[in-house]
Amino acid sequence: MYYFYSPEMFVPYQWGLERNVSYAYMPYNSFYYGDYISSLPYALHVPQNYKIQMKEEERGSWTPFSWVEKYAYAFSGPYNKAEVALTFDDGPDLLFTPKILDKLKKHNVKATFFLLGENAEKFPNVVKRIANEGHVIGNHTYNHPNLAKVNEAEYRNQIIKTEEILNRLAGYAPKFIRPPYGEILENQLKWSTEQNFMIVQWSVDTVDWKGVSADTITNNVLGNSFPGSVILQHSTPGGHLQGSVDALDKIIPQLKTKGARFVTLPSMFQTSKERK
């Protein structure tokens, strides 16, 4: 059975679809069609042949539900805890990442940062600051490829190369992976699960990379978050992200007022931040 939560009170109600799962997989901007799920709010392509096995080239951003059940793979956390997780992709940089860290310190909130290996190499001191201030670091590949278009060897290279960089700078090998664009293939999920990684997508997309205002981002998050929400923001070098930074001063206090607790992904999924 699916559960969704009212953003007003964090009260569960039945969404109306039957499925025996322990997590909530009904974020507002994920699309559901037959046995497939898409995490991209701007993915307008709806597969016409979902009743049969879709070919990889036709699937695009659509993920079979079975992957969530078979692998260490999630879009959101447990629905029975009033927890939400802030996550920031594509950093670090010298402009927005420090501003985000300042805001998080101001509100006494810990978050998860999915870093690119090439940016971590450029800005090692920012990586160290993220780790030293108690935030969790995740693996976002080395240079942000579409993983659905790379072979198995290149996928593994992207992950392991980045892991080595982050381990050297942060002091541990991150357990969590987020695939760029939300794109990943089943063989990649299988290998990652076997290697004790966990792949976490998102359930609320702020679309902050478009340079939208703080009010737009705030309304998006407040209107569509529920217990277990994984919120996607960015700390992209050269991005237009001031609205995303400023929105934190509104999102954090208002969600706390609703009863939400801000946690890192290891806390949400009750596992280690480190791949062991």
Model-derived features: positions:
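Acidic/histidine-rich helix-loop elements
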Residues: 56-61, 151, 239-240
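Catalytic grooves of carbohydrate-active enzymes
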Residues: 226-238, 243-266
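N-terminal pre-catalytic segment of deacetylase/amide-hydrolase enzymes
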Residues: 1-86, 93-99, 106, 250-253, ...
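Metal-dependent polysaccharide deacetylase catalytic core of the NodB/CE4 family, i.e.
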Residues: 40, 81-84, 94-96, 105-238
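Histidine/acidic-residue-rich catalytic or RNA/ligand-binding cores of hydrolases
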Residues: 212-215, 242-246, 274-276
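Glycine-rich, phosphate-binding/catalytic loops in enzymes
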Residues: 102-104, 194-195, 247-250
